[in-house]
């Protein structure tokens, strides 16, 4: 199964200013919706509380602190699923990731929630594709395979 981390990030690597932020700065919501439609989306409870209204027609799996990433993935009977944050959840699933879909935005926060919060082993990524999100503002999604 493909396990795909999907995230909008700032130029300094943050996915939010703080864990309770309702994300208004991201310009890739329509692409996120298109890519995740019909697939399981795994996220932490803070992320779920911040974007729940945007997630119709998807199987949402909200991870608790004690939930096992491996057991969660074993229960999924689909060819792919998405990991959609936050930073702690991304880090917990890092060793299972097969792909990263990252959309850098023209923002710098200086501090906030990192893409991976916690220790993550080094990943070698292989470029697969680039998709336009907002060409006028230079926003593109970069798709990588974890090697």
Q: What does each model-found stretch correspond to?
A:
Residues 1-147:
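Enzymes that bind and transform nitrogen-containing heteroaromatic metabolites
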